[in-house]
Amino acid sequence: MSKLLLILLDGVPYANWRRLFGNLEGWVASGEAQVWKMRSVLPSTSGTCYASIHTGLPPQVHGIWGNATRRRLEFPDVFSEVTKAGLKTGAVTHSFWSEFFNRYPFDLVEDMEYDAPDGPITHGRFHTMTGDSGYNQMTPADVDLFATLTMLCEPLF
């Protein structure tokens, strides 16, 4: 069984991640991974970039102009195309992805974790910044996100 793991590092300068993410560099050195340096769209906000990366379209076409613009995108995207081909997808990421590629609006109860065999994102685990402040840290720790990602990469029976 072949698997593809796409890792997007948001807000980390290219030189820093190449220097600091030794485990990923190890995969590259062993031939188990490849690195692509991408050029950002403008505006270079997270939501705008996510929409462009997964649809291949510029903001002028998909209409996501910043993090406040959220809706279900009605364009072919990586998740829907992979699912159409009969394969499974998974995402451990920000709730923007659920809203863009699964359904809008994001529901904190129903959409935080789901397994939907017929959906564009077959297995989804999402975090959100909703309610985040200095007193209320809503974002899960990196170790929790990577543990969840590891579980999604295990064979599903």
Predicted regions and their residues:
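Active-site nucleophile/metal-coordination loop of metallo-enzymes that catalyze phosphate/sulfate
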Residues: 3, 11-109
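Generic enzyme active-site microenvironment
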Residues: 8
